[in-house]
């Protein structure tokens, strides 16, 4: 901090105060909802990033930690197994859905994720359509829950068969809250 303030003649406290409110879209991004649960969008798209965010959120002692996620197609299958195992171990409920399936079948990807989940005692449901999965999470939320929509983060598209379709989780959440979904 001192190096930055020295060159730019900015007070250290100004930098500290700014860092306290700095936010990065899609990284532990809290989406306001008019209910007594917490809804978070995060870009966690591999086991390590998922583990980091879930272990951190677990420290808040939620009623339940619910993780909705999928895995990208045309990527190493081991990532799917690892993500399933990580979510199964750290979440009270995993909601398995689609992500950027690219040129792979969504259900094949989901089956690979389930292989990882099977290594744990974790509860899970499969909701193949991501919009429906978000609605499922919100409809089944209980007071004190933390819901993590993992994998998309800042992305506002879904890639399927070489085409990027507009899909912004923030817009989907707003539609659900407004009764449009």
What are the language-model segments listed below?
Residues 2-181:
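ATP-dependent carboxylate-amine ligase
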């Amino acid at each position: 901090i001192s190096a930055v303030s020295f060159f730019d003649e900015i007070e250290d406290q100004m930098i500290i105060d700014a860092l306290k409110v700095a936010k990065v879209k899609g990284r532990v991004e809290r989406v306001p909802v008019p209910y007594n649960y917490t809804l978070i969008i995060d870009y966690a798209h591999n086991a390590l990033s998922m583990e980091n965010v879930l272990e951190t959120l677990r420290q808040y002692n939620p009623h339940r930690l619910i993780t909705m996620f999928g895995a990208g197609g045309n990527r190493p299958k081991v990532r799917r197994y690892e993500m399933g195992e990580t979510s199964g171990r750290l979440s009270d409920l995993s909601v398995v859905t689609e992500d950027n399936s690219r040129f792979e079948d969504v259900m094949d990807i989901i089956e690979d994720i389930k292989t990882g989940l099977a290594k744990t005692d974790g509860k899970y449901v499969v909701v193949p359509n991501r919009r429906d999965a978000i609605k499922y999470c919100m409809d089944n939320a209980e007071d004190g829950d933390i819901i993590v929509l993992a994998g998309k983060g800042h992305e506002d598209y879904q890639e399927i068969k070489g085409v990027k379709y507009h899909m912004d989780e923030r817009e989907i959440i707003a539609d659900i809250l407004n009764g449009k979904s």
